[in-house]
C-alpha cells in the first residue's frame, strides 16, 4: 500500500505538461487511445443490428450540416458535449459527425432541438 501512496504523491507533483506527456507514454505503452470509449460505443451500436426489430432505446445525434450560423452551432456543441472551443469548431466544420452517441430518445430529441434552434441540420440514428 505504501507504494500506491508514493505513486499518488509523485503524480500529484507533476506539472500539466508532464502529466500530458505521461498520458501519451501510457497510451503508447498500453496500446490505447483517449478516444477509445467513443470508438467502443460506436462499435457496440454497430454490432447490434439484430436488436433493430425492437424499438430503439439508444440514439446517435449526428450533426449533418452546421448551416449558416456556425458560431451559434459551435456554442451549442460546446454546451452539449463539454468540448473545448477548438474541438467543438473542428467537429462542426467536419460535419457530418456524431455529436453524442448512445443517448436515450428523450435526450437525443432535446439535443436535436437545441442544435436545430442554433441553425444546424441534425439526424438521429
Curated annotation (Swiss-Prot):
* One cellular component (GO) term of this entry: cytosolic large ribosomal subunit
Coiled coil (residue ranges): none
What keywords does the record list, in alphabetical order? Ribonucleoprotein, Ribosomal protein
Note the SUPFAM superfamilies from the entry: ClpS-like, Ribosomal protein L7/12, oligomerisation (N-terminal) domain
One term of GO molecular function: mRNA binding
What InterPro entries does the annotation carry? Ribosomal_bL12 (IPR000206), Ribosomal_bL12_C (IPR013823), Ribosomal_bL12_C/ClpS-like (IPR014719), Ribosomal_bL12_oligo (IPR008932), Ribosomal_bL12_oligo_N_sf (IPR036235)
- Record has Ribonucleoprotein as a keyword: yes
**Annotated GO biological process:** translation
Describe the protein's quaternary organization and the partners it interacts with.
Answer: Homodimer. Part of the ribosomal stalk of the 50S ribosomal subunit. Forms a multimeric L10(L12)X complex, where L10 forms an elongated spine to which 2 to 4 L12 dimers bind in a sequential fashion. Binds GTP-bound translation factors.
Q: Which family does it belong to?
A: Belongs to the bacterial ribosomal protein bL12 family.
Q: What does this protein do?
A: Forms part of the ribosomal stalk which helps the ribosome interact with GTP-bound translation factors. Is thus essential for accurate translation.
Q: State what protein this is by name.
A: Large ribosomal subunit protein bL12
Organism expressing this protein natively = Chelativorans sp. (strain BNC1)
Q: Which lineage? A: Bacteria, Pseudomonadati, Pseudomonadota, Alphaproteobacteria, Hyphomicrobiales
Gene from which this protein is expressed: rplL
Amino acid at each position: 500500500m505504501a507504494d500506491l501512496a508514493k505513486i499518488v504523491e509523485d503524480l500529484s507533483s507533476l506539472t500539466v505538461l508532464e502529466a500530458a506527456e505521461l498520458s501519451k507514454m501510457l497510451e503508447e505503452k498500453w496500446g490505447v487511445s483517449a478516444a477509445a470509449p467513443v470508438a467502443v460505443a460506436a462499435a457496440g451500436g454497430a454490432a447490434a443490428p439484430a436488436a433493430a426489430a425492437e424499438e430503439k432505446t439508444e440514439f446517435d445525434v449526428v450533426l449533418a450540416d452546421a448551416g449558416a450560423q456556425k458560431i451559434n452551432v459551435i456554442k451549442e456543441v460546446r454546451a452539449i458535449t463539454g468540448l473545448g472551443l477548438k474541438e467543438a469548431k473542428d467537429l462542426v466544420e467536419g460535419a457530418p459527425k456524431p455529436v453524442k452517441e448512445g443517448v436515450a430518445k428523450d435526450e437525443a430529441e432535446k439535443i436535436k432541438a437545441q442544435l436545430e434552434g442554433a441553425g444546424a441540420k441534425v439526424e438521429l440514428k
